[in-house]
């Protein structure tokens, strides 16, 4: 058992959790297309040709599928003049500001009809097979170009060099998505997908992404994957007149999904690269069949410095793609000093560049290897990210920034850095607004509900990680104005709406638990409330509190404040400290009213991490010798929390059992609790011991920490309570304990068990019945001896001696057992435990790309290291913005 | 209001609070909205008022659908808007000048 010194799980263990292995379940690329199944979406594609005509095609997709899009970047085929082949027509100026946006909001994969004229004629074939894709993937096309708002208008004149694969872009758009049922739309041209001298891209094995519920339907994110199936299929963006298909972009779906020609960005960049570098190997030789070559990593990084902004943006997007699930690339990027480049781009004047750079950073910051995280810190990444968060109104960017921060926060050296630079911003920009908490609640309006947005989830995950960083971190978070209030409000909102299984709730409870750790020592003014020992009820130090049915006394929250009146009743025998004003800020951590919140979570949630955290919070709050702990312990009883906890002892999940056992142990510092727990919990506790000694089925073996926690709890309740000791006997605890001592592989378990036995033996009154059952002192002693030492105490400072002040025991309660505070540090995007539990519905994963981790996580039976969560996929190529509509749409609201 | 994309914008805003009406099963506001960043701004049907925030939700970079959704949330009976108007902006500027 970790000593109390850390109430938190050792960072080491957390860190390992935090840095999720790059399991295929982790999806880093944001390009996930997810759509709620069954949500009909409508895509409109617009192509504007340079002569100013606009074609608008609307496709209605009635079936939404999850789109996994693979993107392969291809170079623009070069014509004889070395410039990209353009099929007639002036090249677009995609990189002219704003020009791109117009054209590339291809949605629903407009059929060739949307191709610009030149390419239409080329008879390119669309890729076969893609199922109807939701428009989002197509939207990605436009995203690729980084322009969001479509503007109807002629394609601007492109740069004269035409090297920017403009035509390709257009093509790509039109081609990419294969919208709707084939019959539903006309596909005049079918592109012939054929490999074009493309090497297999085996870079990343994209995992299957499963969208999460958080993903808004509007949000198309195409998962970018590069299936090793190679680039066999391409979406031929356009058909080059000269050849049978320069495919510019390869969007290759891993399965017959539509591919979104995401490569626009790449295209452009490739084009420029091509022009600059002229390294297309086969260009010169085979004009007819241009060969494509993906840019090498140094080239991509060089493009990050290219003067033309869209090239930068595209390069960053491509970089993100390359980094996806590829530790080697990530490492190389760092070695090639790519990280400072990206961090610098976070301050770039163009939004698109910033967004892409952030997406790349997100992927780069994710992973087991912490060097990238350190490198990002070294080049000032954290303040840059926070700046970007403050400045950004775009939700996607905010998600990327917070996702990156979440990734970074799992790395211990960065936690304080993040707190220093980002705590205020994260709290005020994200937590407070999304929680629904209002600083000055308007009396007339009802309390707002929390919005469980992805940004909130990421931010709460980040704060969860940093909250585990020790006393100073806890102090900063506690004193951050509005943070605790907002978190509490959000949790209450979740309970009110019965939405307690999601990841954001989990994160919030974990933060609360962490901040509850050692409150009795760390909060300002704590010593005022110290008591000599946890005394009987009503012996509290302070003066009588005026009871008021005033919500404000309980924290000033407008929350579903029905508890006010009821709370008063709970304290009829307790003297609460006099409050002159409502509790706020960190004081809310230990107001007795939080008890009801935690108990509600324990009752309702099915998320094991949330359960563990809520029990952990109660454990933390019940520890310590101060007045508030006394109230909390009594309140738990009065709120009928004890049965809730006892029931959770039956949980199949180790960590939950452990947290609950320790909570019960601390709660039993209250005498009445002790009696009750002794009566009602003994059977369950003994059952757990029995399971430890003789697991009913393989794999059901409890972990050592859990067993020790249970044993300590038993020990606590049978100490100084003859009745409870008797209950233990009646529950047939003795045989189980003796057997455990004999059979256990763990020294700690054996010690703890024998400790209990000795305590039991010390009751002379029980000797009679013990001996009647055949137990002799010798047998007990031998059990103890086996455990190496008569006083083998499970915790330091063995208290066999019942005259030891209870204080020690309470401290022990904190220290021993697994965690007082379970920092749950690593469970950030790097340690996403949401999905890992089998039982847990992998909701947290939500949004783009993270879903992919679900599968593997589900199979992971090991609790210890919940597979690292996905870092939110960084790039969402599909613009969240809806379709481009040439005619204004208005709605009646 | 001119602005540079990507840069913060300052604007004069007016707070408006609207209580939704109940019409049948729905709560309606009673007006139409147009625009959205996915729409062509040159063809905005109602260009006068722009909405910055709805109940705390940022509206400066939303699509039409998103805007509509945020205004029509069932759970909210009151919609608090921050709107900007050209005329408002001008009026404030003039009053500041004079």
From Swiss-Prot, chain B:
Entry annotated with the keyword Hydrolase: no
MF (Gene Ontology): beta-catenin binding
Single GO biological process annotation from the record: Rho protein signal transduction
Subcellular location: Cytoplasm; Nucleus; Cell membrane
GO cellular component, one term: cytoplasm
Main location: cytoplasm
InterPro entries, alphabetized: PDZ_sf
Domain of life: Eukaryota
Tissue expression as described in the entry: Detected in kidney distal convoluted tubules (at protein level).
Keywords: Acetylation, Cell membrane, Cytoplasm, Membrane, Nucleus, Wnt signaling pathway
Domain PDZ: from-to ranges: 12-87
Membrane topology: Peripheral membrane protein
Post-translational modification N-acetylserine, affected residues: 2
Subunit and interaction comment: Interacts (via its PDZ domain) with GLS2. Interacts (via its PDZ domain) with RTKN (via the C-terminal region); this interaction facilitates Rho-mediated activation of the FOS serum response element (SRE). Interacts (via PDZ domain) with ARHGEF16. Interacts (via PDZ domain) with KCNJ4 (via C-terminus). Competes with LIN7A for KCNJ4 binding. Interacts (via its PDZ domain) with CTNNB1; this interaction inhibits the transcriptional activity of CTNNB1. Interacts with ADGRB2.
Its biological purpose: May regulate a number of protein-protein interactions by competing for PDZ domain binding sites. Binds CTNNB1 and may thereby act as an inhibitor of the Wnt signaling pathway. Competes with LIN7A for KCNJ4 binding, and thereby promotes KCNJ4 internalization. May play a role in the Rho signaling pathway.
Protein name: Tax1-binding protein 3
Source species taxonomy: Eukaryota, Metazoa, Chordata, Craniata, Vertebrata
